[in-house]
């Protein structure tokens, strides 16, 4: 039970990190002028 919760937390955390990284890269790659 606890292991399942831990795995879910790790997957969620990884998805959040990937999402933030992708959003940051998109913002950096988009020309601001």
UniProtKB/Swiss-Prot annotation:
Primary location recorded for the protein, binned into one broad class? membrane
Q: For this UniProt entry, what's an example GO CC term?
A: cytochrome b6f complex
BP-aspect Gene Ontology terms? photosynthesis
- Say if the entry is tagged with keyword DNA repair: no
Q: How does it sit in the membrane?
A: Single-pass membrane protein
Q: What Pfam families does its record include?
A: PetM
Q: Which SUPFAM superfamilies match?
A: PetM subunit of the cytochrome b6f complex
Annotated keywords: Electron transport, Membrane, Photosynthesis, Thylakoid, Transmembrane, Transmembrane helix, Transport
Source species, domain of life: Bacteria
Q: Name one GO molecular function term.
A: electron transfer activity
Q: Where in the cell is it found?
A: Cellular thylakoid membrane
Q: Which residues cross the membrane?
A: 5-25
Please describe what this protein does.
Component of the cytochrome b6-f complex, which mediates electron transfer between photosystem II (PSII) and photosystem I (PSI), cyclic electron flow around PSI, and state transitions.
The record's family statement is: Belongs to the PetM family.
The UniProt subunit note reads as follows: The 4 large subunits of the cytochrome b6-f complex are cytochrome b6, subunit IV (17 kDa polypeptide, PetD), cytochrome f and the Rieske protein, while the 4 small subunits are PetG, PetL, PetM and PetN. The complex functions as a dimer.
Q: Which NCBIfam families match?
A: PRK11876.1-2
What is this protein identified as?
Answer: Cytochrome b6-f complex subunit 7
Organism (species): Thermosynechococcus vestitus (strain NIES-2133 / IAM M-273 / BP-1)
Q: Lineage in the entry?
A: Bacteria, Bacillati, Cyanobacteriota, Cyanophyceae, Acaryochloridales
């Amino acid at each position: 039970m606890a292991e399942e919760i831990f795995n879910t937390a790790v997957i969620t955390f990884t998805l959040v990190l990937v999402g933030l990284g992708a959003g940051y890269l998109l913002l950096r790659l988009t020309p601001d002028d």
